[in-house]
C-alpha cells in the first residue's frame, strides 16, 4: 500500500516537499535555502527567514480534510474508504508505572511510528506551496518561509504578509501554531527590528536552529561548527580514558561512531566555513588518530595515511561530488537542479555540464556551492566523472583525494593579495 500510494503521488507532490521522501532529506531542503540566500547576498540584496512552530502537527491532522484532499488528487472511492478505515476507530490510553488510564478514541492525527503516517502527512501538506507566495523551507512539520529583496523594509513586509497566509492555512487545516515560538533572522545586524505575527512581536535574532543546523544571519555557520567541535572534543576525553583496554580496530569504531560522526550530519550546509574552524576540526581529528594508534610522533598527514582516510573537509568535497553526479545523471531530487542548474546544451565533449555563476563578492559568492560545485566537478578525474553507475562512482570518489581544490580553505593565502 505504501509503495502504490507513493508511486501514484510522486509526480503530484511539490519538489520542495523534502520530508519523508525517497532520496530526499534535510540537507536538500537547507541547501536550497542557503544557496538562494547566498546568491542574493552576493547581489547586495537583503534576506530574511521566519522559523515557525506547530504543536503536535501529526496528532492534529483532520481525517475528513485529508480524505477530501486525497479525493482531489484522484483517489478512487475504494481507496479513500480503505484509508479512512485505516485512520478511524483507533483508541489509546496512558500508562504510568502499573496504572492505566481509560481508553480514549482518537479523532484526529495519523498513526505515528507507522509507515503510512508520514506519507499521509505529506499529502495533507502538499497544497501549502500553492497557498504561499514566497519560497518555503519545508521538512515534515517545519515550514519556514524566506525571501529576498533590495531592502529590509521590503523583506519585513513580505514576511509579514506571508505569515498571515501561513497562519490562515494552518487554521484552515485545523492545526495549531505557536507564534510566540517563531524566530526571525535577517541579514541585518540591527536586532531591534521585529515583525508582528498574530499579536506577537518576533524580533530579529543572530542565529536560530533549523532542522538541527544553527543558521546565523551571515551564513558563516561558526556557531554550528563550534558546537560540533565542542561535542567531539568531549568524546575525545572518553576515548582517552578507555583506549588502553581496546584494540586498534575497536578504537577506530569508537572514533568513527562517537567523534567523527558529529561532522556527518548535513555537511554540505556548513562545509564552506572559515580556515580557522577547519584547523580546529583537523586538530580534533588528529588527536583522535593519535589516541587510536598511540602515536605522538607522526604528522597529521602521516596519521591519515596510516588510517587510510581523509580529512573531514576532503570527505565533504567527496560528498559534494556525489551530489553533483546525481544531478548530472538526473537521479537527484528535482530541488537539487535549482541548486546546481545544468546547461541546456553542451557544445563539445567533456564540457562542464553545470551553469557557471558570476560572483561579485568573496564573502558570499565564493562560499556558495552553486559557484563552487561546478569547479569541483571540473577537477574530478575524467574516468571517474564518466562513470554511469552511482555505486561505482561512490566507491571511486571515496578513494579520490581532492587536489588543487579551489575553495578558500585549500587555497594558499598571500598577504596583501589574499587567496590565490
Regions found by a protein language model. Give the residues of each.
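Catalytic palm subdomain of template-directed nucleic-acid polymerases
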Residues: 57-73, 144-168
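Short, charged alpha-helical motifs in flexible N/C-terminal segments and linkers
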Residues: 38-46, 167-185, 209, 268, ...
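Conserved pre-catalytic core of RNA-dependent polymerases
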Residues: 1-111
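Active-site palm subdomain of RNA-directed nucleic acid polymerases
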Residues: 4-17, 42, 118-150
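Short, conserved micro-motifs composed of acidic
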Residues: 161, 176-207
Amino acid at each position: 500500500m505504501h509503495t502504490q500510494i507513493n508511486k501514484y503521488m510522486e509526480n503530484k507532490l511539490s519538489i520542495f516537499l523534502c520530508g519523508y521522501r525517497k532520496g530526499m532529506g534535510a540537507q536538500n531542503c537547507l541547501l536550497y535555502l542557503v544557496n538562494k540566500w547566498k546568491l542574493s547576498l552576493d547581489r547586495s540584496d537583503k534576506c530574511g527567514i521566519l522559523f515557525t512552530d506547530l504543536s503536535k502537527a501529526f496528532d492534529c491532522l483532520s481525517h475528513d480534510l485529508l480524505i477530501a484532499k486525497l479525493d482531489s488528487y484522484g483517489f478512487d472511492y475504494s481507496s479513500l474508504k480503505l484509508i479512512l478505515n485505516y485512520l478511524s476507530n483507533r483508541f489509546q490510553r496512558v500508562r504510568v508505572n502499573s496504572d492505566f488510564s481509560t481508553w480514549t478514541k482518537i479523532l484526529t492525527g495519523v498513526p505515528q511510528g507507522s509507515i503510512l503516517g508520514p506519507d499521509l502527512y505529506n499529502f495533507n501538506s502538499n497544497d501549502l506551496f500553492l497557498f504561499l507566495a514566497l519560497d518555503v523551507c519545508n521538512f515534515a512539520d517545519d515550514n519556514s518561509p524566506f525571501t529576498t529583496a533590495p531592502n529590509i523594509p521590503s523583506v519585513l513586509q513580505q514576511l509579514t504578509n506571508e505569515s498571515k497566509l501561513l497562519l490562515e492555512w494552518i487554521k484552515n487545516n485545523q492545526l495549531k501554531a505557536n507564534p510566540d515560538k517563531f524566530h526571525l533572522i535577517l541579514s541585518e545586524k540591527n536586532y531591534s527590528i521585529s515583525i508582528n505575527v498574530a499579536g506577537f512581536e518576533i524580533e530579529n535574532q543572530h542565529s536560530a536552529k533549523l532542522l538541527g543546523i544553527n543558521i546565523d544571519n551571515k551564513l558563516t555557520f561558526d556557531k554550528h561548527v563550534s558546537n560540533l567541535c565542542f561535542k567531539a572534543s568531549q568524546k575525545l576525553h572518553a576515548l582517552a580514558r578507555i583506549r588502553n583496554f581496546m584494540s586498534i580496530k575497536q578504537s577506530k569504531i569508537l572514533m568513527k561512531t562517537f567523534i567523527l560522526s558529529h561532522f556527518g550530519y548535513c555537511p554540505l550546509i556548513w562545509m564552506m566555513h572559515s580556515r580557522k574552524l577547519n584547523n580546529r576540526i583537523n586538530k580534533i581529528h588528529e588527536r583522535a588518530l593519535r589516541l587510536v594508534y598511540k602515536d605522538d610522533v607522526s604528522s597529521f598527514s602521516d596519521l591519515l595515511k596510516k588510517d587510510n582516510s581523509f580529512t573531514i573537509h576532503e570527505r565533504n568535497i567527496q560528498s559534494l561530488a556525489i551530489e553533483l553526479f546525481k544531478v548530472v545523471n538526473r537521479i537527484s531530487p528535482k530541488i537539487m537542479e535549482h541548486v546546481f542548474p545544468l546547461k541546456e546544451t553542451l557544445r563539445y565533449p567533456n564540457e562542464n555540464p553545470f551553469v557557471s555563476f558570476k560572483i561579485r563578492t568573496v564573502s558570499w559568492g565564493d562560499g556558495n556551492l552553486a559557484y563552487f560545485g561546478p569547479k569541483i566537478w571540473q577537477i574530478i578525474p575524467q574516468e571517474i566523472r564518466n562513470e554511469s553507475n552511482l555505486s561505482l562512482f561512490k566507491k571511486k570518489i571515496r578513494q579520490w583525494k581532492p587536489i588543487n581544490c579551489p575553495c578558500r580553505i585549500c587555497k594558499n593565502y598571500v598577504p596583501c593579495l589574499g587567496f590565490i
